């Protein structure tokens, strides 16, 4: 556990250092005098690290968290907490973790593995016993951090988000803004010089809402029991093992401290596996070692003694050891500029009190100024100009374009650069983190941002060791920071086989990706400002600057194949969001227009120089979190989404409509009924969009009819707003499928938050909150009633006819334009060999009204007839499916041969990647295949193209003749809700089977030309940068109209 085990060590082995306190008494002790007539001084200001306190802010470990979250119960708890703090003269400031923290990626990988195992234990427990799991298996419901953040904003509790290094920013923010104490639960905070450190896990609010208690850690007592000077805590923390120098690299040193005669020495190497000593034993041994160090400034001598048993990568370990010490010393440095707006409590002489680093127990009831304070000199320090304070209390939704960024471009080196005086540089341990030092990922070329280098120079001038911390790299194929170390390790003298205690410990690998497109400085300034204020989805800023995103673990049964993983289910949403963030549609349209004018290549065959690739870190079935997935950004094909600057900052009515249309298009819900308040109320729009998206998923049944009704019935139930009655509601037997459906739904809500913020917040955040439409426990009760008792819709609505009518209207709006029919007979012929590598269309282009098919098809028995306006999907001259056509006049030409795929007939798809051209380019063994290119060379950056338009026309003519003779068609049908045959394998989850089809007959919600955004990820993935359908004159006229 390394340094992270120090927190538990204090509680178990230093009982005198853990003192229970009541925060209201501490607040009363900070008042001036004791008379009632005197006004109180400034309130007791506490900074709360939300990452360690989410379960307490959620309301505790009550048993119904597994059902997807009881958000009204959480809202009531936070309301009581806010009321108690206001009555007790306590001011809370909650700091959320919004940093990507590539330097702690290996810790995140371990945590994801543990949570994934916990999720399987939860599912197994529910399947076997049907009861809620024990609280030790608490797994935060999806979207819990965002919901807590929005609830705190509702109760006017200030919030903020970190942006680079969460721990350092929390410590710096706590000191520079005059907080009396920190409420957290992390060893990094315990080992830094924080005067008042309270336990987040012990934070409790009494039932009457009048007493708020917790525990305080007295670090001077801890130092006394360890017999260690607090000034040596940085070396102590570095030798325990941390995110810079993990305890696996220090295993040989820890075992050497114990000695061969120690009772645990026999466990040093067991079964050829690395075994670490117990944490409490290591802490005592390292404390004894640090106590006996003669000169704590001679780091070279200390490192030489520590790594004398190391057999490989010694120089790298020494470098990391020095960076770890610099990291913890930076957290213990005193304030360079005290906060001008905060004054400590003056003593009778008028002099502001100074607090020692570790207060004595006599100071518990009356906390003095917690930081060293001096009277104001009339000016503000640099740290105050760019901090998280002065957040307006926004009781109602304020449009994004009205929330201008206070950051002055002239003061900041770059709109995307964070002031180095405020944000200490984060130490990275992953390969290629902060390699370029420009605020973006080292894996992206960022030469188009010259102002970032300017800010970096000022950072180097202010802090000498910042450059060393910012270049802390992990050996990897893509990183270049450790070339010298790797070269030295590969010399003949270092070619011996290392022992287990000196093997490399990084269990993740980064991948180099193409450079990100340039983003407007105004957009970056707004994104940074809103990110730090906690007003935006945290990963939007990191996608814009670093091109990376993390996806949390959800409760899903990895053995059962009935439901897809949430990361795969909502990946198309994220792909379209990435396209919106980087203004992909407008950029591509301009490039196509330019290429067409220069007569270089027809627009149908235009391919950009490089695609926009986002790295997604996720862990689910068949995917390890150790490597990222390369996901390509997609653009809407049927309409040109405006650029991000106009989408965010535009004030015209048309801009507002475009925001809403972009959001609906990302959620595949661009239908007129979604904007009809009579059918879909505003506060239920997110609910209906997520349910419609789940219904459209091809290949695997996600929502049945009765399950859809259960979701809608609980959303309009009066019991939703009665958390006390829901607590008394008893559920006899939990259903594992219901638990997984709740997790999938909340994952969809999380993606809806992402899409809404990325599109400029067309839906006010007050109407996005899940307590307006979801309660996990109520949903499980409705699901049991609908599936087990076979209750009718009127019974699900508790006999209220008006509620049943609302459910009917919402269901019709959700299913508008979606036509599903059941397959009666199997396909007459098996799919062609190329099918697994050419995913068929599962989300066809929407079209105008179309009557349901009747009678028998003309081709084969049991196959639904093709509509008169329909078309065929032909790949490599073979018909692999039929799909609903568009308006009259659109051509039905087949896909050109430049559609590419991966591998050969005997090659599988690269592990952990999706079916996009760029992933096939960067994936292992990826090759492009096309007619006329039999002798294919190594993987290319682009698919091959015909040399002339004549050859293309000749190829298309040949394919059209071949397609008429090859009559292999799909069934054109779906099971009950977009399902193919239930026996379909899980490998066909993404639509590779070609057996599921859905037709849409809806119009666009905000467009009169009936042009709906394409909802087919595979068509976009295969053709976004290669080829497109040839457009007829009518289509060209519409395109000219848009231009």
From Swiss-Prot:
It is a peripheral membrane protein. Belongs to the constitutive coactivator of PPAR-gamma family. One of its GO terms (cellular component) is plasma membrane. This is Constitutive coactivator of PPAR-gamma-like protein 1 homolog. The keyword Cytoplasm applies. SUPFAM superfamilies: PIN domain-like. Residues 362-375, 405-419 have a biased composition (Polar residues). Residues 801-1043 are annotated as: RNA binding. Residues 353-497, 929-1043 are annotated as: Disordered. It is found in: Cytoplasm; Cell membrane. The keyword Cell membrane applies. Residues 451-471, 951-964 have a biased composition (Basic and acidic residues). GO terms for molecular function: RNA binding. Residues 995-1010 have a biased composition (Low complexity). Its main location: cytoplasm. It comes from the Eukaryota. Transmembrane segments: none annotated. It comes from Xenopus tropicalis. May bee involved in the oxidative stress-induced survival signaling. Binds RNA. May participate in mRNA transport in the cytoplasm. Keywords: Cell membrane, Cytoplasm, Membrane, RNA-binding.
């Amino acid at each position: 556990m390394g340094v992270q085990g120090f927190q538990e060590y204090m509680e178990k082995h230093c009982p005198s250092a853990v003192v229970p306190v009541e925060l209201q008494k501490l607040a009363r002790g900070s008042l001036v005098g004791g008379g009632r007539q005197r006004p109180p001084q400034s309130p007791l200001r506490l900074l709360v690290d939300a990452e360690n306190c989410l379960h307490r802010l959620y309301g505790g470990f009550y048993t119904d968290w597994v059902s997807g979250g009881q958000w009204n119960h959480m809202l009531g708890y936070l309301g009581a907490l806010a009321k108690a703090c206001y009555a007790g003269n306590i001011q809370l400031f909650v700091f959320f973790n919004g940093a990507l923290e590539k330097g702690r990626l290996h810790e995140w990988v371990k945590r994801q593995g543990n949570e994934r195992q916990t999720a399987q234990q939860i599912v197994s427990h529910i399947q076997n016993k049907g009861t809620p799991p024990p609280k030790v298996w608490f797994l935060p419901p999806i979207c819990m951090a965002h919901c807590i953040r929005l609830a705190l904003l509702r109760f006017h509790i200030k919030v903020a988000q970190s942006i680079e290094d969460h721990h350092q920013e929390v410590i710096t923010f706590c000191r520079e803004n005059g907080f009396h104490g920190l409420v957290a639960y992390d060893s990094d905070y315990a080992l830094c010089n924080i005067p008042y450190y309270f336990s987040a896990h012990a934070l409790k609010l009494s039932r009457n809402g009048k007493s708020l208690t917790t525990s305080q850690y007295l670090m001077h007592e801890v130092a006394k029991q360890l017999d260690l000077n607090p000034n040596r805590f940085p070396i102590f923390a570095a030798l325990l093992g941390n995110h810079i120098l993990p305890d696996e690299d220090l295993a040989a040193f820890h075992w050497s401290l114990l000695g061969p005669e120690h009772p645990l020495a026999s466990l040093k190497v067991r079964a050829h596996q690395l075994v670490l000593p117990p944490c409490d034993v290591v802490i005592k041994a390292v404390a004894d070692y640090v106590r006996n160090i003669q000169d704590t400034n001679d780091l070279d001598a200390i490192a030489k003694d520590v790594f004398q048993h190391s057999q490989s990568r010694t120089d790298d370990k020494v470098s990391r050891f020095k960076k770890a010490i610099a990291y913890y010393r930076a957290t213990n440095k005193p304030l360079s500029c005290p906060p001008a707006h905060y004054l400590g409590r003056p003593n009778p002489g008028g002099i502001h009190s100074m607090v020692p680093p570790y207060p004595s127990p006599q100071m518990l009831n009356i906390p003095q100024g917690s930081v060293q304070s001096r009277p104001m000199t009339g000016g503000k320090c640099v740290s105050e100009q760019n901090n998280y304070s002065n957040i307006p209390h926004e009781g109602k939704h304020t449009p994004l374009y009205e929330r201008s960024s206070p950051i002055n471009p002239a003061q900041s080196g770059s709109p995307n650069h964070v002031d180095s005086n405020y944000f200490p540089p984060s130490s990275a341990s992953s390969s290629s983190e902060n390699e370029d030092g420009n605020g973006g990922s080292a894996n992206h070329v960022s030469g188009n941002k010259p102002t970032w280098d300017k800010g970096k120079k000022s950072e180097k001038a202010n802090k000498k060791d910042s450059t060393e911390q910012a270049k802390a790299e992990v050996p990897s194929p893509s990183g270049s920071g450790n070339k010298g170390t790797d070269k030295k390790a590969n010399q003949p003298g270092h070619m011996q086989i290392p022992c287990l205690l000196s093997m490399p410990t990084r269990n993740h690998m980064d991948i180099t990706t193409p450079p990100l497109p340039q983003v407007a400085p105004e957009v970056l300034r707004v994104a940074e400002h809103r990110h730090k204020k906690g007003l935006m989805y945290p990963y939007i800023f990191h996608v814009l600057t670093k091109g990376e995103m993390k996806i949390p673990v959800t409760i899903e049964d990895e053995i059962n194949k009935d439901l897809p993983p949430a990361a795969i289910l909502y990946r198309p949403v994220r792909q379209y969001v990435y396209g919106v963030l980087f203004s992909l549609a407008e950029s591509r349209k301009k490039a196509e227009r330019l290429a067409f004018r220069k007569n270089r290549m027809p627009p149908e065959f235009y391919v950009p120089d490089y695609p926009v690739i986002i790295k997604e870190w996720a862990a689910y079935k068949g995917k390890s979190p150790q490597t990222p997935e390369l996901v390509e950004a997609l653009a809407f094909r049927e309409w040109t989404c405006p650029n991000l600057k106009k989408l965010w900052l535009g004030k015209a009515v048309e801009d507002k409509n475009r925001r809403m249309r972009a959001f609906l298009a990302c959620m595949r819900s661009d239908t007129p009924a979604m904007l009809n308040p009579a059918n879909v109320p505003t506060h239920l729009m997110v609910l209906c969009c997520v349910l419609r998206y789940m219904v459209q998923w091809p290949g695997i049944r996600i929502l049945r009819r009765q399950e859809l009704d259960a979701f809608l019935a609980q959303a309009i139930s009066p019991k939703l707003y009665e958390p006390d009655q829901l607590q008394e509601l008893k559920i006899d037997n939990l259903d594992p499928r219901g638990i997984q459906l709740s997790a999938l739904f909340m994952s969809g809500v999380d993606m809806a938050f992402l899409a809404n913020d990325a599109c400029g917040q067309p839906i006010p955040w007050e109407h996005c909150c899940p307590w307006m439409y979801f309660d996990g426990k109520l949903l499980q009760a409705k699901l049991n009633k609908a599936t087990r008792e076979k209750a009718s819709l009127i019974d699900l609505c508790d006999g209220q006819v008006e509620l049943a009518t609302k459910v009917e209207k919402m269901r019709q709006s959700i299913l508008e334009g979606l036509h599903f029919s059941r397959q009666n007979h199997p396909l007459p012929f098996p799919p062609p060999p190329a099918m697994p590598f050419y995913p068929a269309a599962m989300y066809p282009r929407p079209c105008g009204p179309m009557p349901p098919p009747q009678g028998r098809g003309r081709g084969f028995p049991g196959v639904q007839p093709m509509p008169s306006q329909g078309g065929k999907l032909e790949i490599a001259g073979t018909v692999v499916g039929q799909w609903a056509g568009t308006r009259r006049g659109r051509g039905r030409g087949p896909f050109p041969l430049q559609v590419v795929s991966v591998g050969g007939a005997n090659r599988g798809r690269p592990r952990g990647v999706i079916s996009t051209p760029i992933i096939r380019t960067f994936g292992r063994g990826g090759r492009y295949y096309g007619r006329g290119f039999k002798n294919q060379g190594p993987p290319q950056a682009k698919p091959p193209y015909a040399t002339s338009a004549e050859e293309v026309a000749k190829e298309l003519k040949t394919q059209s003749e071949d397609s008429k003779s090859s009559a292999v068609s799909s069934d054109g049908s779906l099971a009950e809700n977009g399902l193919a045959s239930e026996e379909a394998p899980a490998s066909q989850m993404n639509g590779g089977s070609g057996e599921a089809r859905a037709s849409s007959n809806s119009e666009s919600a905000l467009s009169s030309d009936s042009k709906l955004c394409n909802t087919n990820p595979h068509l976009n993935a295969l053709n976004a940068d290669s080829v497109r359908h040839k457009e007829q004159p009518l289509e060209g006229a519409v395109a000219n109209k848009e231009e």
